[in-house]
């Protein structure tokens, strides 16, 4: 009798699971990605059973102006990430939105709203704001993880981030970690992106502010992967489907892009799609080898021209790996001498003001300072990790003289960056924040200290 009770209980459990799987459900989201003056992108992922998706939205100040936009994606696939564009919005306006699945509102435990950017140019001072940034988010999945101590740490850091008011969030690479079972097929790559984006603890953060992202090796493919990765096209498509940047590379290549907020321009670079293998010779006949690429010629031309075009107070170049650290023996643009020297020479020759590098990857945080004769110093702000294993600096890096004193953080953290001040007196402040919201380090730079003597 006891055996039959167990059998019946097991059968009922299986039936419940099957019914749940057959029911149209929201897998993750919704959240507002790229939000502009008159446009916003709403992202979500739904189960294969969902037949239709729509977004209903209205301005908080006037609910009678309710509108509905239908999703045009083909649904019913194994994975169904969707993006819905909301156009014709008013600037500096807060909107409430809800996701509609098969004509029924999807239930969420968090607020779903966004505020369009303000049209401040030629009208008022550049708005003060803050944003969040960081890298290396690892969620454990024991059946596929390496044996031993779990690599993923305390994911409550994402709740702390959700509780930190900010205008937007920049994911600086390794936003999810593909395993051996993932990066050998396109399906596996999509599985990892879908699974890691669906974690409950992420949802409120994603919905609380617009999201922007670059990638690094682990969300691109295998460890240290670059131009030779056989699934790089599939990986690019998956990255496009699970992020909401304004654009993705040029001519169907790469994922680099750009966006602006207030008087700051962000250059989202791609350090994977065009990147040569690290083992490739860095020099030939005593000269840096042009054949060893980091950004690649096309992206480098875009970056240079975008920097020349920019009138922003601060110009933040976001890279998955460090750019400036002379003591980084692992993955760093410095190890790609031709492009590294070319970029630094370009910045100097054109006397471009306000340049800062932001990077991830290292599993610790720090700020590297590189002096330049006759010009302002360059800084590389590294913020890592969110939840991946913490790395302790060793050997000569432990006493890195290029590191700004007081900026080394060797525990889980994220960055809260504030831009404030009067015109011509703007200040950018970086705070390294711990799991519980504690301050682990800080640094600031003034606009005037990143100026060149441009005529």
Segments predicted by a language model, with ranges:
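Metal-dependent phosphoester/phosphodiester hydrolase catalytic core
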Residues: 21-455
């Amino acid at each position: 009798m006891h055996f039959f009770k167990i059998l019946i209980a097991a059968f009922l459990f299986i039936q419940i699971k099957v019914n749940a799987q057959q029911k149209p459900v929201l897998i993750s989201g919704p959240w507002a990605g790229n939000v502009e003056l008159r446009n916003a992108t709403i992202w979500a992922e739904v189960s294969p059973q969902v037949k239709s998706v729509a977004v209903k939205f209205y301005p908080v100040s006037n609910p009678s102006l309710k509108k509905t936009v239908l999703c045009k994606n083909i649904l019913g696939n194994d994975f169904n990430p969707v993006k819905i564009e909301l156009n014709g919005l008013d600037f500096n306006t807060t909107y409430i939105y809800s996701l509609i699945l098969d004509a029924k509102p999807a239930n969420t435990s968090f607020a779903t709203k966004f505020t369009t950017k303000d049209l401040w140019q030629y009208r008022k001072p550049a708005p003060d704001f803050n944003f969040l940034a960081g890298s290396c988010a690892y969620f454990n999945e024991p059946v596929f993880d390496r044996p031993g101590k779990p690599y993923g740490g305390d994911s409550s850091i994402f709740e702390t981030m959700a509780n930190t008011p900010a205008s937007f969030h920049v994911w600086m690479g390794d936003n999810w970690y593909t395993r051996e079972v993932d990066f050998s097929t396109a399906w596996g790559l999509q599985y990892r992106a879908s699974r890691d984006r669906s974690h409950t603890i992420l949802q409120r953060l994603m919905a609380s502010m617009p999201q922007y992202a670059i990638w690094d090796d682990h969300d691109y493919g295998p460890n240290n992967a670059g131009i030779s990765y056989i699934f790089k096209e599939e990986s690019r498509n998956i990255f496009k489907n699970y992020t909401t940047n304004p654009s993705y590379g040029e001519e169907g290549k790469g994922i680099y892009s750009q966006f602006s907020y207030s008087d700051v321009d962000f250059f989202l670079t791609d350090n994977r799609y065009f990147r040569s293998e690290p083992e490739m010779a860095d020099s030939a006949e005593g000269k840096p080898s042009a054949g060893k690429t980091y950004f690649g010629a096309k992206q480098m031309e875009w970056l240079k021209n975008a920097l020349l075009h920019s009138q922003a107070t601060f110009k933040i170049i976001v890279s998955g790996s460090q750019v400036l650290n002379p003591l980084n023996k692992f993955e760093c643009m410095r190890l790609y001498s031709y492009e590294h020297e070319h970029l630094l020479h370009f910045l100097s020759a054109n006397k471009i003001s306000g340049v800062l590098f932001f990077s991830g990857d290292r599993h610790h945080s720090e700020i590297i300072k590189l002096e330049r004769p006759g010009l302002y110093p360059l800084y590389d702000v590294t913020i890592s990790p969110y939840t991946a294993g913490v790395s302790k600096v060793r050997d000569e890096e432990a006493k890195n003289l290029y590191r700004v004193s007081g900026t080394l953080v060797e525990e889980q953290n994220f960055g809260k960056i504030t831009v404030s001040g009067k015109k011509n007196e703007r200040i950018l402040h970086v705070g390294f924040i711990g799991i519980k919201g504690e301050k682990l380090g800080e640094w600031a730079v003034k606009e005037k200290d990143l100026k060149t003597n441009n005529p």
